[in-house]
Structure formats: structure tokens, C-alpha cells
Regions:
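Nuclease and nuclease-like effector domains acting on nucleic acids or nucleotide cofactors
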Residues: 2, 22-23
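Structured, acidic catalytic/metal-binding patches in enzyme active sites
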Residues: 23-47, 52-276
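Bacterial N-terminal signal peptides that target proteins for export
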Residues: 1-8
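C-terminal soluble interaction/assembly domains
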Residues: 274-337
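Hydrophobic alpha-helical transmembrane segments of integral membrane proteins
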Residues: 3, 13-14
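Cleavable N-terminal signal peptides
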Residues: 8-10, 20
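N-terminal signal peptide c-region/cleavage motif recognized by signal peptidases
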Residues: 15-19
Length: 337
């Protein structure tokens, strides 16, 4: 379930060492391989409000918010996006992100002081909770990422799930592996002495995983283990979809791909997708709206957050539109000086 990755990358990089990369990923875009009829059907399912594009502008009563959907891993394709956003960054009074420098420092401190956030401190270990076959497959997947299996035996299931969503070719993690669009904008903002503020408290992400039962977390881990052979292809598909402005198309594809997992039923896939969407996207979107609107009262705002938060009926763009904001595709030529 690659949708977990953006929300937990910060936690993952706070735990794992960042070393020199040993390889480069060359995955296949799985959406591009679909037969025309299946692609047409997928696109129809993915057609929701504001489904296409990563950069948007919201205006209301003279207030202006530039919204940038982000992808959280480094990629050279960010260069033209950063160039396009330069006028908005130069005129902004604040940069809003999911987690700013203060929040990142706070979560690292919290992790160091509370091992239970990321580790099983009591009860059965993962080898005891998973089937022998799943543990053997997990051990193989971990070894391909340069990790000894015992290192994961007491990790929280959601953390191992997130780890497996990063394909083996990314390991060991390179310095700067997390330099996605948001991090690069933060660096530019800091150089301009522009305030950087968070859309949510540092511990909001911890509350998200509290909404998943232990059984849900184990089920997600088992599904991710079963799909590990395609992790490189899924990562490539996600990146390509993002840079094509089609992140929601990938979201729809990943939901469909769940049905190919062993034992997965439509009812269970729908239940899990609803749970993930509500906990990781919809609830957070609703909580961000007051923060965005309050920031806009003091001047132009540039907000950068995961691209999957933009589209859909419960997406940030539609929620703003329902509150009277005019939503238009971002055009740097129209950014006021």
C-alpha cells in the first residue's frame, strides 16, 4: 500500500541510517502497461474533482493561497516545478508544510524517548504473529534491503509495512533521499528567511496509526509482503504519475491492484481503502482548512503537502471551494509582485 509512504517517510528516516546508495531504481510504470480498455476504465474511476495537476491557486476576498502537491522523495524532475513556484515563494508571507523543522525535531525527540512508538515493547514479536511463510518472505525482503531480519522482529507492523514500500533498489538510503518538493521548498524558504509553519501538530501522524487495530496493521503488512516483488514497479508508477499530474490515477490503480493479492475480496479491499482514506487523507484535509484560511489572513501563502491531499470530494481543493474560495490551476505569470 504505497499510500502509507508519504505519511511515514519522516519517521522512517528518523530511524534508519542514511548511507551511500548502492543502486538506482529502474522500475516499470504499471499503468502504462494496461490494455486500452482497462486504462479507460481506470481513468473513469479516477475522475474526481480536481483530479489533474499538482499546482493550484485559491483566491477569496483578496486573499491568495498557492497550493503545491508534493512527492516526498528526491527526483531531478522537480527542477521546473521549483522554477514555476519561485514567484509564489518570493511573495509568500509563510510556507505551510505537513511538518516543519520544529515538528521534525520534536518527532525525533519523541521517538528517542518513547520506543513503543516504533517498537513492540511487550507481547508477541512479528515472527510470532505472522505465518511462517510470511515471516520467511519478510526476511527475504529485508535482506534485499540490507537489513537483518531480527532488526524487524520487534518493529511495529505499520513501520515494517512502510519500509517495504520503499523498493530494495533505494537501500542503503542515500543522504538527501527525502529531499522531495516540500523539503526543497523548505530549504529555499529558510534561505529567504521566510517563516515555515506546520499544517498539523508533530504528533498528528502518531494518532493516525492509532486508528488502525493490531489486526489491521498485520493484514496490511501481510499484503505488502505478498506484493513486494512489485515494489520497484509501484514506486516508479507512483513517481511517473506524480510528475504527470496524475497522482489520483495512481491512487485508483493501487486500490484496484489490491484485488490481485492472495485471498483479497472486493469487500475487504473497499473496507481497507475506506479506512486508509479516512485516517490518512480525509480527516487531515478537514483539519488543515482552518490553518490555511487563518494563514491567508496575514498575506499570500504557499502551502506544500502530499499531492494525494488535493483531489476528490474530501480533498483540500474541494473543501476550500465549498467555503467560497475560487480554485484555478496555478499560473506563475499571474502571481502578484
Amino acid at each position: 500500500m504505497p499510500r502509507l509512504l508519504p505519511m511515514t517517510l519522516m519517521l522512517l528516516l528518523a530511524f534508519l541510517p542514511c548511507l551511500a546508495r548502492a543502486d538506482t531504481c529502474h522500475g516499470q510504470n504499471l499503468i502504462a502497461t494496461l490494455p486500452p480498455a482497462q486504462l479507460t476504465e481506470l481513468k473513469a474511476r479516477a475522475e474526481v474533482p480536481y483530479a489533474h495537476g499538482n499546482l493550484w491557486t485559491a483566491t477569496k476576498d483578496g486573499h491568495r493561497i498557492t497550493l503545491a502537491g508534493t512527492y516526498h522523495l528526491s527526483d531531478p524532475r522537480f527542477a521546473p516545478i521549483l522554477d514555476a513556484l519561485a514567484p509564489a515563494l518570493a511573495t509568500a508571507t509563510v510556507l505551510l508544510v505537513e511538518a516543519g523543522p520544529e515538528e521534525e525535531a520534536a518527532i525525533k525527540t519523541r521517538i528517542a524517548s518513547d520506543p513503543g512508538l516504533m517498537f513492540l515493547t511487550s507481547g508477541p514479536t512479528l515472527p510470532e504473529q505472522l505465518t511462517p511463510q510470511d515471516w520467511d518472505r519478510l526476511a527475504t525482503a529485508l535482506k534485499s534491503r540490507g537489513m537483518l531480519p531480527f532488526m524487524a522482529a520487534k518493529m511495529q507492523p505499520w513501520l515494517v509495512t512502510t519500509l517495504l514500500q520503499m523498493p530494495a533498489c533505494l537501500f542503503p538510503l542515500a543522504p538527501g533521499a527525502d529531499q522531495g518538493l516540500d523539503k526543497q521548498l523548505m530549504a529555499q524558504a529558510a534561505a529567504q528567511h521566510l517563516p515555515i509553519k506546520a499544517l498539523e501538530p508533530y504528533d498528528a501522524i502518531l494518532g493516525i496509526f492509532g486508528q488502525f487495530t493490531a489486526a489491521d496493521q498485520l493484514a496490511m503488512l501481510s499484503q505488502t509482503i505478498a506484493a513486494d516483488a512489485q515494489s520497484g514497479d509501484m514506486a516508479a508508477t507512483l513517481a511517473d504519475s506524480y510528475f504527470a499530474g496524475e497522482s489520483h490515477l495512481f491512487y485508483a490503480y493501487s486500490a484496484q491492484a489490491m484485488l490481485a493479492l492472495p485471498g483479497m475480496t472486493q469487500a475487504e479491499a473497499d473496507r481497507e481503502n475506506t479506512l486508509v482514506d479516512r485516517a490518512m487523507i480525509a480527516q487531515r484535509n478537514a483539519a488543515w482548512i482552518p490553518v490555511l484560511e487563518a494563514a491567508a489572513q496575514t498575506g499570500p501563502v504557499l502551502a506544500a503537502f502530499g499531492a494525494l491531499h488535493l483531489p476528490g470530494a474530501t480533498g483540500v481543493l474541494n473543501l476550500l471551494a465549498k467555503r467560497g474560495w475560487t480554485i484555478t490551476p496555478f499560473d506563475p505569470r499571474l502571481t502578484p509582485p
